[in-house]
């Protein structure tokens, strides 16, 4: 059980399942919250919204879609959708899950984001510590804003749009669940609130390996996939809601992955045609380095 307690691990090579193992309380097709892996699904949904013209360009300022943001802080006029995709918003927003006395006040905002009845209220008082596009800094508020923009641009709920454009076309094994801030406001937590199973998670990986096609149908444009998987070592490897890593400065020998607390992940190795997906409950451990799976693929495939 090298994949840890309380979880399920799936390895797919050349479209065939070569490893599928779980421990209780998990079982095949059980849905579990995938936490920040949700961000990569939100990035996918953004690409579809761009393809369909709901979002004209990732270079559009966020105020084109949520004009009221400009009233809260003029810097929002400089913030573009691409900055959200790359975690370069510049928000003064603390995100650290280590509970210390010093960090209790700072962690209050992330608690508001995850458990507040209207997370959009956070944007009324948010400050910027960097100019948009200036610096990478991971925080979930950026993807919260991105999911809000998708809903505003499409005039559809996140769940309905995801179901129509991704879940149904890919023939997912089970319905996914999404968390909203409240029934009254109904803003979707696209930054960490999706629950799905390991097989459907792997299908997302296959969609990216297939250049955005599924059974001959283009789900998201190849242009978006290519841009998402663009080989860059800048921005700490985070690009269009995916992490990228390279070995020995060899851009052709690359892998990319989505990762969430508790060790939820999708790992994709293009060169080896391998997808590894995991869901689990390891909340006290952030997990292996993804380079472990690079080495694993080298040895097994």
Predicted regions and their residues:
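Active-site Gly/Thr loop motif
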Residues: 173-174, 179, 226-275
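A short, well-structured edge-of-sheet supersecondary motif
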Residues: 1-26, 171, 266, 273-277
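Catalytic-site signature segments of enzymes, centered on catalytic residues
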Residues: 29, 98, 105-183, 189
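Active-site-proximal alpha-helical segments within enzyme catalytic domains
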Residues: 142-149, 190-213, 264-280
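Active-site SXXK
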Residues: 15, 33-58, 84, 146-150, ...
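Non-transmembrane alpha-helical segments in soluble domains
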Residues: 47, 63, 82-85, 120, ...
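Active-site helix/loop module of the DD-peptidase/beta-lactamase fold
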Residues: 52-94, 125-127, 153-191, 196
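Structured C-terminal helix/loop/strand segments within mature extracytoplasmic catalytic/sensor domains
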Residues: 258-301
């Amino acid at each position: 059980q090298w994949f840890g307690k309380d979880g399920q691990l799936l390895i797919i090579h050349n479209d065939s399942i070569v490893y599928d193992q779980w421990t209780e309380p998990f079982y095949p097709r059980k849905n579990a919250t995938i936490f920040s892996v949700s961000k990569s699904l939100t990035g996918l949904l953004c690409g579809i919204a761009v393809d369909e013209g709901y979002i004209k360009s990732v270079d559009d300022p966020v105020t084109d879609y949520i004009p009221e943001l400009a009233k809260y802080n003029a810097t929002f006029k400089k913030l573009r959708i691409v900055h959200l995709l790359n975690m370069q918003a510049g928000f003064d927003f603390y995100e650290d899950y280590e509970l210390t006395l010093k960090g209790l006040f700072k962690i209050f905002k992330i608690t508001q984001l995850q458990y507040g009845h209207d997370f959009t209220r956070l944007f009324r008082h948010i400050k910027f510590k960097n100019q948009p596009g200036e610096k990478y800094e991971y925080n979930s508020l950026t993807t919260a804003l991105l999911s809000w923009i998708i809903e505003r641009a499409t005039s559809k709920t996140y769940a309905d749009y995801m179901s129509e454009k991704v879940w149904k076309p890919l023939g997912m094994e089970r319905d996914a669940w999404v968390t909203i801030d409240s029934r009254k406001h109904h803003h979707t937590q696209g930054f960490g609130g999706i629950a799905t199973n390991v097989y459907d998670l792997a299908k997302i990986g296959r969609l990216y390996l297939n250049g955005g096609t599924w059974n001959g149908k283009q789900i998201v444009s190849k242009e978006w996939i290519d841009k998402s998987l663009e080989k860059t070592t800048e921005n700490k490897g985070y690009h269009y809601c995916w992490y990228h890593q390279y070995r020995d400065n060899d851009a052709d020998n690359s892998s990319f992955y989505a990762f969430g607390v508790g060790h939820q992940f999708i790992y994709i190795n293009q060169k080896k045609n391998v997808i590894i997906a995991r869901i689990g409950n390891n909340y006290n451990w952030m997990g292996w380095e993804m380079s472990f799976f690079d080495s694993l693929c080298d040895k097994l495939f």
